[in-house]
């Protein structure tokens, strides 16, 4: 028993030392001063040290219809509660979740006390433009994100605060954009207008050029017949799927040097300039489901190319890659060419031009009489890269695989991790 006493002493000293460190950290790091008898902090730490998240005193409150979690003291969750009106919002709330309700109006009093709001999610409700009081959002000088998608809006919700960075208006009935709608929105980086009723006349006058920091623009599933004019130089991701665009001006992309990804599938493109996509930063290009009859020049940094469901009868590799540069390889890794009118596989010369290519998806092809045929090659061809070959030199370089679903690559919202990190 005597030998255990020193252990008890050491353990007691260790506990005192650790506790003292925690106390020093709490005051030194959080308050940066010695506590006084009459000092009362605005918030205190939750008893569960694992979370380390502050929670506000009960006096700040929470709407009775909603839930305000202790670990996220500035968030209020009122989603999916069959609400017909916006509840009272405490002053300290910064993130407000009201999606999936039956809210029909946003009145001048809806956010009268909530001056610190940074994000409002009103998606999946029944809001109409006429039921949004003028200037109700513009008064929120800290607002950064506004979700109004999946409602019944007929007009753009103008005016909006200068602080706004992300604006989601998809799945509405918007058909007009006033010339002053984008005034003051100098910090918007992401604008989603997919699934509306926008036409060429709606975007005339280069209305979108006012968004000087815009990086992502979604205009899919509208009524556009030509490329949207006056897009800002800052744009990196452009979605134009499911419109009726039939041509692209030859110098159109010269004004978009930072473009990383372009999705213009399900349109009516037939003849496009040979080097129209000669963009040094372009990584993903989807021109599937058009009426293209031949391939085009492939920029050096392009990695994913989708040509499915066009009218292509043969692919001339020298058009895609007119010259070889052993010091600067092309980066193309994935090519999809199913549902075209190919009669034979692509020439093996493609692997000299694009040495990094991993996969070519041929799928089924369409014959002149409308029947589907399969080429005398694997439906899905994969090619090992150098690292895989080093691991297993004996493994066959081709194998069959399943078709990568179009939905995975063709979502109108950009879901690539790199995009999310950028925006």
Curated annotation (Swiss-Prot):
Looking at the record, the residues that make up the LRRNT domain are 53-91
Q: Name the GO terms of the biological process aspect.
A: cell adhesion; regulation of bone mineralization
LRR repeats: which residues? 92-113, 116-129, 142-164, 165-184, 187-207, 213-233, 234-255, 258-279, 281-294, 301-322, 331-353
| Location of Sulfotyrosine modifications | 22, 25, 31, 39, 51, 77, 413-414
UniProt region (Disordered), positions on chain? 383-408
InterPro entries annotated for this entry?
Leu-rich_rpt (IPR001611), Leu-rich_rpt_typical-subtyp (IPR003591), LRR_dom_sf (IPR032675), LRRNT (IPR000372), SLRP (IPR050333)
Explain the post-translational modification. Glycosylated; contains keratan sulfate.
Where does this protein reside within or beyond the cell?
A: Secreted, Extracellular space, Extracellular matrix
Extent of the signal sequence: 1-20
Residue ranges under compositional bias (Acidic residues)?
Answer: 385-394
Q: Which domain of life is it from?
A: Eukaryota
Keyword flag rRNA-binding: no
Name under which the protein is recorded = Osteomodulin
